From Swiss-Prot:
It comes from Proteus mirabilis (strain HI4320). This is NADH-quinone oxidoreductase subunit H. One of its GO terms (cellular component) is plasma membrane. Its EC number is 7.1.1.-. NDH-1 shuttles electrons from NADH, via FMN and iron-sulfur (Fe-S) centers, to quinones in the respiratory chain. The immediate electron acceptor for the enzyme in this species is believed to be ubiquinone. Couples the redox reaction to proton translocation (for every two electrons transferred, four hydrogen ions are translocated across the cytoplasmic membrane), and thus conserves the redox energy in a proton gradient. This subunit may bind ubiquinone. It is found in: Cell inner membrane. HAMAP family: NDH1_NuoH. The gene is nuoH. Keywords: Cell inner membrane, Cell membrane, Membrane, NAD, Quinone, Translocase, Transmembrane, Transmembrane helix, Ubiquinone. It is an enzyme of class 7 (translocase). PROSITE patterns: COMPLEX1_ND1_1, COMPLEX1_ND1_2. Its main location: membrane.
Amino acid sequence: MSWLSPEVTEILLTVLKAVVILLVVVTCGAFMSMGERRLLGLFQNRYGPNRVGYAGSAQLIADMIKMFFKEDWIPKFADRFIFTIAPVIAFSSLLLSFAIVPVSSTWVVADLNIGILFFLMVAGLAVYAVLFAGWSSNNKYSLLGAMRASAQTVSYEVFLGLSILGVVAQAGSFNLTDIVNSQAHMWNIIPQFFGFITFAIAGVAVCHRHPFDQPEAEQELADGYHIEYSGMKFGLFFVGEYIGIVAVSGLIVTLFFGGWQGPFLPSFVWFALKTGFFMMMFILIRASLPRPRYDQVMAFGWKICLPLTLINLLVTAAVILYNAQ
């Protein structure tokens, strides 16, 4: 096996890591849809899905079979190519962000020195899926949802990036592994508490989750940008939303809660437990908060979150300069 050089071995290991992380993230995103329905039932003092399988354990399989056999319909008035490519972008964009998230000290697909910038790039790419879906459907409700999504994403991605800069300044690196290692003695949640708050809010908005689900507000836009989608195309949008939740939860853990670090248990177990906690917080937020008006969402971002992020960044810079003297 002379062809099995160290370079080839490294490539094969990287591909193996990518496949494993892909399968785990997609599986977690799919199971979260069932877990959300059960937890919402618990929070609202009612039964969740409990008919298919033992205590509803096979509900996810039933939903997948139902969605697989639904008619994959494309409207005659739609732009077929863009209409088809939009759910693929929605599914794959935030999934790419897990390539840079270190699950443990040795398990990361791409240990990029510009990892933070890569995440901001794929987060910005996700909005194109919504824009393509809304525009190509040639439906007024879809188009309104796409316009809302573009305005909301542009607004909230401003302080999504600014909220990370305090962490980057403290760690001295854009590399996520270096950021985790810099939290060996103290997690960033303590010195960067306001950065965590604004990043979490922006993360919910980027995922278009309640209460920032303005692009698909059912009561106003009849499900918004994916109103014309059915079958597996709708399934890609549906699972892609939950993959975004997993990705944002993993990044919150990596940036502010020490990543894989923790006592006694293996590192990947700690990462999974922390990420699962924040995935549950997404569900709790949906069960607890009402949906505000669209103008209130935009005003909250520009008038409250952005100034708070800038103040946090200025204070962080002042503390770093003071300690350097």
